Amino acid sequence: MYYLPSSCLVLFLFFSLFYHLPCASSKQTLGWCESQFQCGNITAGFPFWGGNRPEVCGHPLLELHCLDNITSLTISDHLYHVLSINHTYNTLRVARTDFLQSICLSPFPFANATLPPEIFDILPTYKSVTLYRCYPVIPDLARYGCPAIGSVSVSDNLENPVSCEARFTVNIPTSFVPNEKRLNITSLVRDVRNGFEVRLRIDENSCQECSSSHKYCGFTGTLPLETKCRPLNLPTRLSSEAKIATIAGVSLLPFLVLTLVVHIIRKQKTSNDKGQQDLKEHIPKPRIKALIQLKQYSYEQVKRITNSFAEVVGRGGFGIVYRGTLSDGRMVAVKVLKDLKGNNGEDFINEVASMSQTSHVNIVTLLGFCSEGYKRAIIYEFMENGSLDKFISSKKSSTMDWRELYGIALGVARGLEYLHHGCRTRIVHFDIKPQNVLLDDNLSPKVSDFGLAKLCERKESILSLMDTRGTIGYIAPEVFSRVYGSVSHKSDVYSYGMLVLDIIGARNKTSTEDTTSSTSSMYFPEWIYKDLEKGDNGRLIVNRSEEDEIAKKMTLVGLWCIQPWPLDRPAMNRVVEMMEGNLDALEVPPRPVLQCSVVPHLDSSWISEENSISSEI
């Protein structure tokens, strides 16, 4: 015999008993339209609906939502904040939510939004301007400096120049004149955040007649806001069938509701237990304890935090990073991992378990995680200045002060020292590179992206790897060739050394001035020794002795760290001492003898993507 599941049986009884009840009281919903939508300082009636106003009370496309006392409205698949509503003139001021944080993003993540002309008219006090990214720059267009992009061009006309590869349109006051505010992005951002005003195309006379006849205004179609009058009150008498259905439904309502609630709670608990069990099957016991202590978010909460994943700030090999805001107003970065069906989420487990055991000024702070089936996300603090690789390019690094570069290198060293020697469980990162070093407002570095990390007891000095991991150019020789010894925390030391040489510009010089050298030079810059003998410190010619001392110290530390043999490299606590100590105490490290197998075959199966996860302005 076939048995209905308990949930189906309960629902069947529920809908059977209440079949006549909606028919008996459907007209009563019309009385609910007297109520107003309330959210923060926004009060709205017809043609809006939402909250305690059912859909019948408004236009299908004008549903208002309230979250944290902020009213929002979806127009043409774009979310807008409703800043104000003027019922006298049927106008409202709206602002696109994806413009509220910043319009200086690379690449442009924005798409043009079209307002339905049957419903909205933009007030004549506003106009549309188009923002472009043009290569080469068009001289006739006003340009504004953006930290993450370089420059943005603005035009009043909507013609698309051929050389402009990215564009989107914003609505701003007609008083805005691009040429008069040249190079001042602040005024443009302010005008965009203040939103723009639109008028609803409502037949005001018809609605006034409804009010005078003690009726309320309704709509007749889906797109045009054609109105008609509807009664506010119910008929006073119900049929006997309706009365019986109503009494029966009301009598059994508490029992059915209680049954449904108990069933849902049991089902949800079973589902959660199964999901947690699936996760725990692949996590060692020490890591489970670390996960339990973290705040766990539901996937719906993650969607609210990221405003339905509105703003992308970074992309990498393991997922996409979105900008988000917690309920207390804190800005966060939310990394949503890619489909994990094939690897049981080991990258997710590595990152969460590793970051959950850290607390250091130079390690990015983990705030929580989400794990619902194959939907997994990591929430951590947001770094306004993005990743280090954007600051050590040939153009930007030449303008940075040597003390700033030294502070960044020292901060990363302290962070790695903490991972190797300061944690209860030693953490080896395995993917130290500029893209995985984030910078806060004060250019203080924080190590991030622990997707390839491994945890081991501090007494263990050797790690066993089933696969080679890291990014080409930063991988220690022993990781892909056991000729050089065993893999250990010294592998991070090598990656740090290459990072330091990147900071002082050594990698750029290698690619431009040493193209005729052997392929092994991409792992060990042989030419640096020659420059040290000549007195050149590898980045630029400095005039002050203090800067010259900093440059030489960073160069020597970098060379010690990238020694091919792990035993010849200093541990990270010794690296910090070298960075903080006197230059005179540092010796020039011996020139290494590289083995032929130092350059591996570039197999994508073990190379992490270069575009790792990072946040941007």
Curated annotation (Swiss-Prot):
Compartment(s) where it occurs, according to its Swiss-Prot or TrEMBL record: Membrane
Gene3D superfamilies reported for this sequence: Phosphorylase Kinase, domain 1 (3.30.200.20), Transferase(Phosphotransferase) domain 1 (1.10.510.10)
Its EC number(s): 2.7.11.1
One Pfam family per UniProt: GUB_WAK_bind
Record keywords, A-Z: ATP-binding, Glycoprotein, Kinase, Membrane, Nucleotide-binding, Phosphoprotein, Receptor, Serine/threonine-protein kinase, Signal, Transferase, Transmembrane, Transmembrane helix
One GO CC annotation: membrane
Residues recorded with modification Phosphothreonine: T468, T471
SUPFAM superfamilies in UniProt: Protein kinase-like (PK-like)
Topology class, membrane: Single-pass type I membrane protein
Catalytic activity: L-seryl-[protein] + ATP = O-phospho-L-seryl-[protein] + ADP + H(+); L-threonyl-[protein] + ATP = O-phospho-L-threonyl-[protein] + ADP + H(+)
Signal peptide residue numbers: 1-26
EC category: transferase
Coiled coil: none
Known glycosylation sites: N41, N69, N86, N112, N184
Domain Protein kinase: 307-594
Extracellular-side positions: 27-243
GO function terms (MF aspect): ATP binding; polysaccharide binding; protein serine kinase activity; protein serine/threonine kinase activity
Residues that bear Phosphotyrosine: Y380
Ranges in the topological domain labelled Cytoplasmic: 265-617
Residues that hold ATP according to the record: V313, G314, R315, G316, G317, F318, G319, I320, V321, K335
Transmembrane segments: 244-264
Family: Belongs to the protein kinase superfamily. Ser/Thr protein kinase family.
Record's protein name: LEAF RUST 10 DISEASE-RESISTANCE LOCUS RECEPTOR-LIKE PROTEIN KINASE-like 2.4
Organism this protein belongs to: Arabidopsis thaliana (Mouse-ear cress)
Gene encoding the protein: LRK10L-2.4
